[in-house]
């Protein structure tokens, strides 16, 4: 049965408008973005099949283009709608944080960074520049590496932070197709950068690693040197 033939109170759009987003399942939210299903499936059924196949909305949005387009019922138009929804969320978060909402909680930081770099197929290294109140001054990917490593220039990180007038920074990188467990090289870089920051009265607040299914905070897990 097509969604338009459902009782009004069961239709995702009507539920969203009448009750609020918190009353919708992940599949119902996704169905609204998909707008239509296929000849064999309603938008809800298509959304459920995508979530089941990839393991969740986050995993779907992080999946390679080829993997998503290989799913029955998904063409380039629907894939573009999914990418646009992700980009809208990223831009909303960026706008909110730059308008004065501070990164004063570890989960907020992890959520923000995860949306920024989780889809990257190569390892990237990013820097968040913050003022004393933990308000975001600037976010930038400074280095792009390969599938399993990324060379980082400590001097360039410090120069960028000073140019932005930062009082403190948070660094972040991803582990494409791996978990978020920090390597010995990750820990060594963090220790080196923390000492370099202290030498110029700049605080390194945290190091975030975005893995395949997890995001890790050095500060939250008391990983050296925090």
Swiss-Prot record:
GO molecular function term, any single one: metal ion binding
Q: Which Gene3D superfamilies match?
A: Cytidine Deaminase, domain 2
One Pfam family linked to the record: RadC
- Classification via InterPro entries: MPN, RadC_JAB, RuvA_2-like, UPF0758, UPF0758_N
Species of origin reads: Psychrobacter sp. (strain PRwf-1)
Which BP terms from GO are recorded? proteolysis
The residue ranges crossing the membrane are none
Q: Which PANTHER family match?
A: DNA REPAIR PROTEIN RADC, UPF0758 PROTEIN YEES-RELATED
Q: What residue intervals hold the motif JAMM motif? A: 173-186
Q: Member of which family?
A: Belongs to the UPF0758 family.
Q: Which residues bind Zn(2+)?
A: 173, 175, 186
PROSITE patterns registered for this protein in UniProt: MPN
Q: What is this protein called?
A: UPF0758 protein PsycPRwf_0491
Question: Which key words tag this protein in UniProt?
Answer: Hydrolase, Metal-binding, Metalloprotease, Protease, Zinc
Q: What residues does the MPN domain cover?
A: 102-224
